Amino acid sequence: LTVRPGEKLTGYYIEKTSGGLLLHVKRKPQSKDQSLPLKGLSIMLDPGHGGTETGAIGPLGLRYAEKDINLNLAKKLAAELEALGARVYLTREDDRTVSLEDRLAMSKMMLPDLFVSLHANSMADNVDISKVDGFSVWYREPLAKDLVELLYNHVTGSLGRTLKGTHVRNFYVTRGTWTPSILLETGFVPNPQEFEWLTDEAEQTRLAKSIAEAITAYFRE
């Protein structure tokens, strides 16, 4: 799909019908409610891992693994987005195992205006854990690039996070073309300093607010 310069398309998908193939193209939605800038928009949050899939392990081991960090942040971010008028869906609301296929299928079924997968990073065993930190954003489809750059710059700037960059990668949950689909790596769980920041309730709230601000700015453009 080739998009003309200046067109603000945020999604497309092909539907098979009895008459052939139907191409759906979506333009960026915008709320006209100044007090609720995300009113009428739907956002899907994807807390990474869960259940038997713990994700990265930090200083407290399984007592507070990446899966818990991701879910706590997702709930805080959901509250921030709902306060701005958005309808928010979560791929999981508790500590359960959800396959990558099911996560992407939920996105395809709901067709949200935005899909955000929340993760925290790990690292190799032979790396000095005190020297690896930072925030990064990942995506696959070019239609997510504007959002990625805006969110990355806002979060790292407002919170003073170490820059780990924006990256193109074929992560399964970012394959959706029907909406901007991105994956956040909020920090490195094995790093004790990063772990303390990632698990602190006040810092989680600050991060959630910063992400919500960036999302709001994106839909106002």
Question: Residues of each region from the PLM?
Answer:
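Soluble non-cytosolic domains of exported or imported proteins
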Residues: 64-72, 94-101, 141-146, 198-209
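A short, gly/pro- and small-residue-rich
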Residues: 129-146
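Surface-exposed edge beta-strands and adjoining flexible/disordered loops or tails in beta-rich
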Residues: 2-36
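Sec-exported extracytoplasmic/periplasmic mature domains
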Residues: 75-86, 108-112, 143, 152-160, ...
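Solvent-exposed loop/turn segments at secondary-structure junctions
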Residues: 49-52, 63-64, 93-98, 120-125, ...
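Active-site histidine-acidic residue metal-binding/catalytic motifs
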Residues: 24-106, 110-114, 124-127, 131-133
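Buried hydrophobic packing residues in well-ordered domains
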Residues: 1-3, 45, 70, 107, ...
